[in-house]
Amino acid sequence: FNVKGLEIASKSRIKNYYVKYSNKRNFENRVLKLLNKNKIDLICLAGFMKILSKKFIKKFSSPIINIHPSLLPKYKGLNTHMKAIKNKDKYSGATVHIVNDKLDSGKIIIQEKVRILKSDNEKTLKKKVLKIEHKIYSKAIIKLLTNY
């Protein structure tokens, strides 16, 4: 499926599933069944470019977390690097937050910032932010599981 996370999970002998997206309702119902069947108590989203329904979030009673490539609440949604460059921001960064029923608006678990240089463009900024995303996601999970 060309999904790096699934490749790593398979090589590490971690149970994993690929759920084909046909439509939102079917997808979410199939995912919820798998989560319940396997007694999953934390969902970590990364590069998941879909918005979960209020119903899904409510039905999955454990935390759902997401990593976002901006210093939320600034630049929710897409094109975060372009917006930061266009607005001549001095800093950008990454945020791990709890998913709620509003886009990129849940409680912030952890953030880290990077300096935006005059020489930066979308591509170089994306690379810098991705580097800290990899660093802070595991920290956020530990923080969440140890109740901060």
Cite the ranges covered by each PLM segment.
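One-carbon transfer enzymes
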Residues: 1-148
